Amino acid sequence: MQLTDKIFKGLYRRGVMLEQMKEPALSRTVKQMEPAEPCENPRDIDALSPEEILRAAEEADIVDETDGRPLAEKLREAMGSGTMLLIDAIDDEPYVSSQMGPMLALRDQCAGGIRLAARALGTTDATVLVYRHISDSEVAIPRNIGGIPIKRVGGKYPAQCQMEEELAERYSGKGSWLLCGACAMIHLYRAAVEGRPQTTTFVTVAGNCVGFPRNVEAPLGTPVLELLKLCGLTERPTRVILGGPLTGTATEDLRNEKVELSTTAVLAIRDDKHEYSYTCIGCGRCTAVCPQGLNPMRILQELRRGNRRAAEELGIEDCTQCTCCSYICPSRQSVAGEILLYRQKMKGGEEP
């Protein structure tokens, strides 16, 4: 299946163009907190059958970081369908490079995992996707890894979810494409060739308080504080975020907060100025940037009035929590955060 380049260019997508600030973490080597012992008897990658590949992914408990689903389950559903395999190394949020960094640093393992996944699917059609708009990158993005082509995804943030929606709309036939994470491919190679289970995850440790930003391969359950100690703090952060700066969550309990499979980044940030929120001025910027075409402030106003039905009619369930509305708001209102709180109340059976 050939995908049109218009899907990847993203010329007409809504959203916000963000300064990526991925350096210097992206160009540095991936730090392993607990280096693995070398495998004495690696299996021949070319001799593995599709069923053996799936069994290895199953026994290693590999979870795809793109959607949190077991990799074996995703591959088995599309097995033998000739599906085009798309590898997610997009990382379109600032600071975060926990997919692109390992893909580049461990490219032989990543390429090996992609070939294994493609064999399980019964396809030779595979492509790695990276974000186009990384102006500060100090590392050259190659045209391919191990012969597998790399395509650049353009467009404003959130480029990835908008690309997925366009793919789903244009190529709606079952088995036409499958999106898997670059890190899941690394773990698939290790599981199938070396017999290693997934006990680690890749995390970007960065922010303006981090002395040595880099991507770290951390054991699951590692306290967040240990990651910050490893990379060093130059000053006391005013907030620590787990995940990207737009979609992540703030934490204060650094000793008891543990690294999970869903932890893409630990960002230590110091804000030197206090932000105050003001009354909505009705500028309409939140509506202009919303990738779903919603009117976020109007939805929030209806929720504040307790008008659940009006909020539903305005499309509250279509909100993807990309937080573009909060980012662009000149009044500094936490539009996306408030909408999320109301949605959680509504799911719990409470009225807004």
Segments from the language model and where they lie:
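Active-site gating/interface segments in enzymes
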Residues: 158, 167-168, 233-281
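Hydrophobic alpha-helical positions that pack around
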Residues: 47-51, 55, 60-66, 122-224, ...
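Ferredoxin-type iron-sulfur electron-transfer modules in oxidoreductases and energy-metabolism complexes
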Residues: 264-277, 287, 291-352
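Short glycine-rich loop/turn motifs
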Residues: 82-84, 200-203, 263-264
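Short helix/loop capping segments that flank catalytic or ligand/cofactor-binding pockets
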Residues: 95-98, 213, 228, 250
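Iron-sulfur-cluster electron-transfer modules
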Residues: 1-125, 132-133, 144-148, 157, ...
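Predominant activation on well-ordered alpha-helical scaffold segments within soluble catalytic domains
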Residues: 54, 111, 115, 186-189, ...
